[in-house]
Amino acid sequence: MVRVKNSVTAHSRHKKILKRATGYYGARSRTYRVAYQAIIKAGQYAYRDRKQKKRIFRQLWISHINAVARQYGLSYNNLINNLYKSSIYINRKMLAELATSDQVAFLNLVNNIKIHSK
């Protein structure tokens, strides 16, 4: 019976893990066992934060829209409600971009909404 040795496989697997852990502090970048745990945890954080990123950006867009809408005498919820009532379908990302970078277009949008809401 031939004896199976895993030293080459184990060494390459350890090297792969340690390569992914470069830049980590202390033993996390030098010791396989600690580096493996750090990489697993980093992956969990990355997965969680990819989901949170979408929520955070939506909150940011809404706060930008609300801040500019209040300058023109509308609250955020009135603005969105009247947009849908007047059949203007624009997502919050584009609306926030209009509100921050192109004030004239946003003002035209608000005036259009005010006309249709009466």
Curated annotation (Swiss-Prot):
Identify the keywords attached in UniProt to this record, alphabetized.
Ribonucleoprotein, Ribosomal protein, RNA-binding, rRNA-binding
Return the similarity comment: Belongs to the bacterial ribosomal protein bL20 family.
The cross-references to NCBIfam families, in alphabetical order and at most eight, read: rplT_bact
Biological role: Binds directly to 23S ribosomal RNA and is necessary for the in vitro assembly process of the 50S ribosomal subunit. It is not involved in the protein synthesizing functions of that subunit.
UniProt xrefs under InterPro entries: Ribosomal_bL20, RIBOSOMAL_L20_CS, Ribosomal_protein_bL20_C
**UniProt superkingdom:** Bacteria
Q: Which residues form the signal peptide?
A: none
Give the record's GO biological process terms.
ribosomal large subunit assembly; translation
Q: Which HAMAP family match?
A: Ribosomal_bL20
Descriptive protein name: Large ribosomal subunit protein bL20
Which GO cellular component terms, listed alphabetically, does the Swiss-Prot or TrEMBL entry include?
ribonucleoprotein complex; ribosome
- CDD domains cross-referenced by the UniProt entry: Ribosomal_L20
A Pfam cross-reference name: Ribosomal_L20
| Any one GO molecular-function label of the UniProt entry | structural constituent of ribosome
